Amino acid sequence: MKYIYPALFQPEEGGFFISFPDIDGCFTQASTIPEGLDMAADALSLMLWHMEEEHMEIPAPSPISSLNGNNGSFATLISADTLAYRQLHDTKAVRKNLSIPRWLDTLAVQHNINFSNILQNALMRELGVSKA
């Protein structure tokens, strides 16, 4: 899933404290604004991934205009793509048991077919996703 949430960058000694008012417990820190943008995207992606995995309700994002920046703080929009994040970080292989006709297994073995690779490619094609 793709999401966009407002983040609040608050200056602090040595950099910025970055929080997402709509997502409880989602925050990070950075030394610079460019680093903060990367760190914020990573923190948001991780938190939303966790919420999806736990079947937690994901709140609607507030309008960015609802965040008031003061004392040098500012708001910006951060995007997160949990599918892309999963493809980068959730790569542990899982074992799947499947059944195919014996004749098909025999033919595939004769042709040195990699069953795992074929199944992965077929699933990605069927689901309309590509490798990260």
Predicted regions and their residues:
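N-terminal segment of the canonical double-stranded RNA-binding domain
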Residues: 1-14, 19, 23, 74
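Short, charged, surface-exposed hinge/linker loops at domain edges
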Residues: 2-4, 42-99, 103-111, 117-121, ...
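A short beta-strand motif that forms part of the nucleic acid-binding face
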Residues: 22-24, 111-113
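A short, flexible beta-alpha/helix-coil linker loop
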Residues: 23-25, 104-105
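A short, exposed loop/beta-hairpin motif centered on an aromatic-Gly-Thr core
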Residues: 24-34, 97
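A short mixed-secondary-structure module that forms the rim of ligand-binding clefts
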Residues: 31, 37-38, 42-45
